[in-house]
């Protein structure tokens, strides 16, 4: 009875175990996740790419920048769009921005290209005999120092005929010539040479070209985007929480200047101070003002310009007559505006550098090249070098509430004396200089000071002041002051994520149906969750393609406009690069989609299972709480692995599809009678006949071998054999007696078809008998295995129950034995303790008894 109960329990356990296992399998299958490809996701990565320019310049303007921008830049967008990216935090670094390097190279290339067709002034490297100039003016009170600012020089120069020379007179600024061997004994006459002749070649700027810059917009090619930081308190480096995306930057004027930044953008709220490292006094400090300061510069004289032939087909432009005082070039700055601005700058510097007990001092430049020690800039085609000591000569006093300044200026206008140079060594490059031809007439230019470039003196141990001086010289800092809030990123429209959808069947691809989604822009959904952003994928993907096409058309028109020049500028080359890069990126993405079997699809499920080692986050965490940017960072290390698995899966699917299509041609009954299949039928027929003949031979050989083993001689199976029974012997062997008297013969078959039919019949019977025997044997083996297995399982179950009971009894016996032993040991311990206690308690009694005995 006990065994039957155990068997019944075991059967119940088997049923419940099978049910639980099935439920586990179903649940696990229901939770399987598969890789799904998304095209058009708002994901980007930092990148460096070739930017192109846009400008609204007019083609009829003769100014070089304008001509260059008109022919080499695309027109600006009259309605530029800026798309805010909510819930996005991006890192910016103005000190490691490739846009700055590109702009620096572009402006240098612009200046170099403007000089290429111009006249080389190498013949001017001759000995100059110079003396002070005589000024033709009604005012006879002319300062001697001002007279020495310009020299009237004579020199011999080749005329239109190379074998003839003539003496030529022209005027040079004192800064452009250097004496040879000291002054002569004549006092006001000596030998000079041009300042560049021992270091660099000189090229005269083309006379119809001025250097007044116009705004230039830098634009990203298709497949890339420009991110803009709109955080007012952004200091140029670090995370920015107010980010937007634009296709082009704002209009940036390529103003080449030192110490002061002119006609740039202004800060919002308050003055902004930016530096790569505030504690390093070797790093430049870029100050962005919140309110512009007007600066008016002028050369008050009325100059004339003359052309001097220096050889066949070459002309040198020099200053002719001088009307008025040409040396009195100067700039005017409002003292009130400047003091107010500098006080705000000092307040911001104090926050970054010093404590509340330190004064801030502004001082003039400590020395260096004239481009560094003065405020150098271009005004109306002339290069001014102005002394800024009047601007940087004050102290921010500690504890003074009215921001008292000590300025060495009495009037309300600060006058900055300026000098003019015509030989300019641009970009601090050795070996190349430019001669700026003089500009006739009065020159006046009005600009806005929008920024300052400062350097900080090293702080000594015994000083409580911080001294700041004007700096500059590296034009990258000028461009950095405008490009600090931009960065270029590469759009990565392909994304993979786990979903429950699986590519289940092998079928021909169909183009995905577009979803009617509201237009948010390609990167507009960057801050949305993955689930919300996936709704706009169709619109984003179409916008990407349309943006590429539109941009290619604009670039193509700009390139076509340069064909009459028979050459391309640096911008033309970059536009070609931008066109190729945009098409290449789009084709690369489409190639990947085609390899994965996702051509024309925005959401493409695959049959690649999602590996939890890539990311073990749940579906709700992924699609409801994460953005595509966060998800891309989560799986960026496994992206290439996933791509390879998708490609392998698609390759296998194509193989399966090819096999399926190969079988599809037999689906129609009429295809069986197609003439193209006849050769295939003949081949199969020949194979069957050959197989039958081979089997016939094999069975014949086996039959002969079998008969030989039984003692018979091999006879032809096509010969009729007649056996005459002996009168006293029955048919066959003794055990076969009693059979009827008849002849025994082998069946004689004649003809091809009867022979084939007989062989086929024998083959079928043989196969049937052998297969039946094999099936019976297999069924018997399976039945035996099942019975033995069930008996073994029952035996093992009973054995487990038996040994469980035995172990239980053994454990109980062990516990009883331990309890008894512990009880005995405990009783002895208690008895010993009791005896010790009684002995201790009887000590007084024993003492009393001892005393009583002693007294007795």
UniProtKB/Swiss-Prot annotation:
Region annotation CD4-binding loop: where it falls in the sequence: 365-375
Region (V1): 130-152
Pfam families, sorted: GP120 (PF00516), GP41 (PF00517)
Glycosylation sites: 87, 132, 138, 152, 156, 183, 198, 242, 263, 277, 294, 302, 332, 339, 355, 364, 387, 393, 398, 402, 411, 448, 461-462, 465, 611, 616, 637
Extracellular side: 32-684
Region (V3): 297-330
Motif stretch (Di-leucine internalization motif): 855-856
Molecular functions (GO terms): structural molecule activity
HAMAP family linked to this entry: HIV_ENV (MF_04083)
Family: Belongs to the HIV-1 env protein family.
Protein name (record): Envelope glycoprotein gp160
Species per Swiss-Prot/TrEMBL record: Human immunodeficiency virus type 1 group M subtype A (isolate Z321)
Gene transcribed to yield this protein: env
